[in-house]
């Protein structure tokens, strides 16, 4: 019988982006330590190819983020995951966006709330189209809600609190780019790992600065 952890995947390109981003933040030795702890030594010096094949399993993604917390503690692991998420956007997710017409010019004339909503919707479409991750956007009380209904970051994990910090970092950097350099508060309010139905990230549409 097929394990449920093997049913859903990121494309190789996104797996590669995650590992390259980890290396940028932690150094190669840090990445190798995480891969060894996660029993993923086959990926050492052997990152996935830069293609769209769906071969980088959700369980692998979840394992990597969990090992960050095991190696560096909950607080240290959270900080690293946020930085890795920001790097993921700059190292490749932004390129997906450009392919979909998500350029600064496309958003320049929109007022900020419309710009954020259009950008968030387009990035949700990116994940829904190219990966097995499922994202839904909602607006409530002036805030944008980014619902991850099938989440690789906490796949098969159990926790007392939200753990999808990499997604928070990625969205923070995406919003920074979309808005032309403004900083927004992004907070994960619910998490499947904590028993909730979705991993929901709440985005304040008013920038901090």
Mark where each language-model region is:
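Short terminal or interdomain "cap/linker" segment that borders an active site or interface and mediates
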Residues: 2-13, 17-18, 127-168, 176-209
